[in-house]
Swiss-Prot record:
This is Glycerol-3-phosphate acyltransferase. InterPro entries: G3P_acylTferase_PlsY (IPR003811). The chain crosses the membrane at residues 2-22, 51-71, 84-104, 114-134, 158-178. It comes from Neisseria meningitidis serogroup A / serotype 4A (strain DSM 15465 / Z2491). PANTHER family: GLYCEROL-3-PHOSPHATE ACYLTRANSFERASE-RELATED, INNER MEMBRANE PROTEIN YGIH. Keywords: Cell inner membrane, Cell membrane, Lipid biosynthesis, Lipid metabolism, Membrane, Phospholipid biosynthesis, Phospholipid metabolism, Transferase, Transmembrane, Transmembrane helix. It is a multi-pass membrane protein. It catalyses: an acyl phosphate + sn-glycerol 3-phosphate = a 1-acyl-sn-glycero-3-phosphate + phosphate. It is found in: Cell inner membrane. Belongs to the PlsY family.
Length: 200
């Protein structure tokens, strides 16, 4: 009964674009108008405002975490199924990528996906975060780190998530994140991808 409203609320939470919100708060340009044009922490970092980039990263991760945790806390009282929780997780990411509040022009979903995974399975999220950190510090390329961690996510989920529907949701999330990184993948192949913090 409450499955559809839960998914809708998760989508709306995911639609809060912290890259745009934080940038407006600090009087910065809209991140969709410079650099890669992506409203995410990496692009905000290109502005040179490290604090704004950090807040964007935390905000985008937090909304994924809150959306799914809220559903999990209310799962029993509202009678939500495990499949509904999986749908809520996916909806938070869809909201980030296609936000209703910002003309359906959103980010690539890495931070939000991490927040979602943290709510579903902290161990899975930790594995992905560690992989991201190792790749980011090793190669200084955010997209390469994100892509590697994204590919690892469904594999880690197979071992650490308790429900099949959550594993499939993680796979769907990974596919969406990879698709949103199409241009980054092409740039990596061509050797033209920007380093972390490098202005375009």
């Amino acid at each position: 009964m409450f499955n559809i409203p839960a998914v809708a609320v998760s989508y709306l939470i995911g639609s809060l674009s912290f890259a745009v919100i934080v940038s407006k708060y600090y009087g910065m340009d809209d991140p969709r108008t410079y650099g890669s044009g992506n409203p995410g922490a990496t692009n905000v970092l290109r502005s040179g405002k490290k604090k704004a980039a950090a807040l964007t990263l935390l905000g985008d991760a937090a909304k994924g975490l809150v959306a799914v945790l809220l559903a999990r806390v209310l799962q029993e009282p509202l009678g939500l199924s495990d499949s509904a929780i999986a749908a809520v997780a996916l909806a938070a990411l869809v909201g980030h990528m296609w936000p209703v509040f910002f003309g359906f022009k959103g980010g690539k979903g890495v931070a939000t996906a991490l927040g979602v995974l943290l709510a579903l399975s902290p161990t899975t999220a930790l594995v992905c975060a560690l992989i991201w950190l190792v790749m980011a510090f090793g190669f200084k390329v955010s997209s390469l780190a994100a892509l590697t961690a994204t590919i690892a996510a469904p594999l880690a989920a197979l071992f650490f998530m308790p429900h099949t529907s959550w594993i499939f949701a993680t796979l769907a999330i990974a596919i969406l994140v990879l698709l949103r990184h199409k241009s980054n993948i092409l740039n990596l192949i061509k050797g033209k991808e920007s380093k972390i913090g490098e202005k375009r």
